[in-house]
Amino acid sequence: LVTLANSTDDKGQFLFSGYQDNTKPFVQSGMDIQYAGDQGQRLTQVSSSRQLAISDAGADVFERIKNGNGVFKTAADPLNTGTGIIDVGSVIDPTSLTGDQDEINFTVTNGATTFDVVNTTTGTSVSAGNAYTNNHTISVDGMQLSIKGEPANGDKFTVSPSNNQSIFETVSKIVTALETPSSGQPGAATRLTNILGATLKDIESGLEHVLAKQTAIGARLQEIDTLDSVGSDQDIQFQQSLAELQGVDFAKAISDLQRQQL
């Protein structure tokens, strides 16, 4: 993936380093990957009045990718001990979105499971004492999500606005989750399921983002090829016209024109 991000063109110039086409855009140290380019986008003149981009900043292609579902993200607290699994959720009413963070807290008393929803941004209660059933759907502030399984007493889940996350960070999270020992750890299997569920969605979003950028680049390259083809055709026409003009007997042509004017 880093090799792809450090791709070069046929001149050996890096495609995703902004204006710094001689600088490798992404530098890797273990699992840490830093962007070393800038935010520039190189342009080429395709006509007297128009320019087209021939590069993209690597930060825009590989790092500015919204995590979660693109609007908000869900997460299980790493200290949860139950088997509650939360999905990525969806937006059901964009006009009700607040951009606040919410927390879903579970209580289990005498075998009955309830949950409270708290807006942790404002510190206010959204709802309390809600009865929980398996595969429960929860709606809050224009968002909808589901939790299945059996959350334990004290387990909690968060819902917060999506933020930019690089595709490298997403892959790193998956690797870390898979390498973390789970034997004998309460809720470890459920914790892994929650992490993989979230990060696989992030991978999907990352691939969609990169493919969209690739499509845009391909469209620009195709337009440049088309303009080159049109320019070549015009060159041929100009050469033919020039050849015809060079073959004209100008003395005879002037004489004929004068006779026509008499």
Which residue stretches match the model-derived regions?
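Amphipathic alpha-helical polymerization modules
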Residues: 2-30, 52, 172-262
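Cysteine-poor, low-complexity segments in flexible/peripheral regions
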Residues: 24-188
